[in-house]
Amino acid sequence: MKPIRGLFGLTAAFFLLTISSHAVAKDRVTILYDAFSDNKAVTRDWGFSALVEHDGKRILFDTGNNPEIFEHNVKALNVDLTKIDFAVISHRHTDHATGLKYLLKIKPDVTVYVPADGDNGFGGSEFPQVFYRPEPSLPVKMRYFDGTYPEHLRSGKLYATGNFILVDKLTEVAPGIFLLYTVSKIPRTLELPELTLAIKGPHGLILVDGCSHSGIEEILQAASAVDPHPYIVFGGLHLVRTPVPEIDVLVDSLKNKWKLEKVAPGHCTGEPAFLRLQKAFGDDYLYAGAGTQIEIP
C-alpha cells in the first residue's frame, strides 16, 4: 500500500502544482506585429497585431499587413492561435486585416468581431432598396433587376470561412471585456468605423487601439461609458503626420485631462509622438515594439 500512497501523493502534488500555475497566470499583452522591435526573432513591417490575455481569455486584436510575416512572427513568439477565444479586427485597412488569411487557415471557424462598415467585406454588406434610386421612365432592359428590386441587396464576403460578427455599438463580448465603436470625423475618413478593445481592470480601463482614426480623445470619451478612469492605452494613436504643436497639446491632455496612467504606444503613433509621450510619462511609458510582452495588473 505504501507505493500507492506515494503515487497518490505525487499525483496530488502535481494536481496542486497545476492549479497553482493557473492561479498565478499573468494577464498580458504580446505585440505580434509592428514596424519597430528590439527582438531579432521577429520581422518588422508596417501594421499592427497583439495577443491580449485577460482573466483566462485569449483575444487576437488585428492581424498585421502580410500573412506570411504574421505567421512568421506568431511562430517565432511561440503563440498558438488555435487556442484564442476570438479575434477583433479594428477596421478595414489592410495593415490590420491581411493576416486573417493565415488565421482562417489554422482556425477557420474562429469568431471575428469587425466594425459594421459597408465597405469592409468581412461579413457581407447589406444595402436597402432605396440604394437603387429607381427611374421608372427607363426601358426594362436598362433597369436593375428589370425594375423589380429585391428588398435588400447583400454583397459577397472577402473570406469564405470565419464567423464574422458586425459591431455597431458598445458591446460586451465577455465579462468585463468590451468593444467600443467609434467613427472618424476627420475629413475624407468620415466613413471609417473602428473598434477598440476595452477591458475592466483593477486599476482602471485597459484599452487596445488599432489606429485611433476616430481620435484617441474621442475613443476615451466613448470608453468613459464603461469606466471613466483609463489606466493604459496600447497600440496606434495615429499621430504619425500630426504637427508637433498638436501632439504636444494632445499629450498634455492625455496626462492631465484624461488622467491616463500609462501608455504603450505603437504602429501609427509616430516617432515624434513616441518621444513626447516618453518625456511626459517617464517610467509609465512602456516600450511596445514587436515581440514585446507586457504584463497588465
Language model features: what each stretch is:
Residues 1-11:
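Bacterial N-terminal signal peptides that target proteins for export
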Residues 68-113, 117-119, 224-234, 238, ...:
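Active-site metal-binding motif and surrounding structural segment of the metallo-beta-lactamase
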Residues 111, 196, 202-292:
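Cap/insert and terminal regions of metallo-dependent hydrolase folds
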